[in-house]
């Protein structure tokens, strides 16, 4: 099963194929998208029209308007396909449906949805008159043009005047349609995250906490041993599990860290560092739960050892760019992002003494900062590939406020958008649960 990233990538490749007029490749890429949206069926229909196959285009536009019954531009293009098949009555019906979906608006701007096209009401009426001309209904065609002219479309008065003159002379009209080469494009905010990162030759292992690791540099190992750091198997436990090509939340690290860390090793002498290590009160157990999805480019046939090395380098990069969060004492659900150095130092000062230690979470969000966290009030099932689904009580990291109604967030290694009305700020959810108590059932 392809991931969201793979589907967006195929969508983008299909758009590029349309731009170079490679119709077969475009259809192949658009057809590879799992559970296609109405926009994807629309794209297929446009490609079939450009390739000169109106019959296949008609089937694709049928699926598009079935998926989205309010898709005015879909009805417009289906009318164009029927017109090319000389089904003029069906074309008139489709243009009427397109006009109905305009809902008395003069224009629908599809640019914000990824299609560089503005559907004008006068164009739909013009096409309706054109189909009526082909059906021999010249009087109806003239009346339709009168209705189009009455809307006083900006910049189209001359076109409609010429069209009226042609109809009076019983000269057929040419159709208006979506310009050649224009199809729905994927959301721009996803495109910048498509390219996998090349980790070959860029990451270096400067130190290791793995016992008997022969890859660490001798000088660094001797410094660590002299400072009293003797990593053992109990200090580092890594469990890596994969499902469906994605790294699932299965990477856990338990290690010892200073409660109030001072300067780095290069700024502290080995003697003072060793003294600090021997003081048990200066140490606290930190458990880090990591969630990563790692994209890799590897040569076909790469050996297991080489692949594990590349994966280790990729994980090293992810830990450097991932979002750290901590679980406050007594909190079972809420993870609070650590966004600044001051935040971390405040956490060190408030870590309680005891075996519980400090619980951290590191999530791969491609280096994007977490604005705040929200908690789901209801279940939300993804309706489209770009959506993020969750269940009631799940905590979601908010990465971006898309608009007044939608947020972009991250949960369990997945990034997507979701309705703002399904979530509340983490603190508000906790307060509501304390006041109201658990609520039976949920809402989809």
Swiss-Prot record:
Residues 369-428 form the SH3 domain. TPR repeats lie at residues 7-38, 39-71, 73-105, 122-155. Residues 285-365 form the PB1 domain. One of its GO terms (molecular function) is superoxide-generating NADPH oxidase activator activity. Residues 258-274 have a biased composition (Low complexity). Residues 1-223 are annotated as: Mediates interaction with RAC1. Residues 215-280 are annotated as: Disordered. NOX1, NOXA1, NOXO1, RAC1 and CYBA forms a functional multimeric complex supporting ROS production. Interaction with YWHAZ prevents the interaction of NOXA1 with NOXO1 and RAC1 and its targeting to membranes, hence reducing its ability to activate NOX1. Interacts (via N-terminus) with SH3PXD2A and SH3PXD2B; the interaction is direct. Interacts with RAC1 and NOXO1. Interacts with NOX1 and NCF1. This is NADPH oxidase activator 1. It comes from Mus musculus. The lineage of its organism: Eukaryota, Metazoa, Chordata, Craniata, Vertebrata.
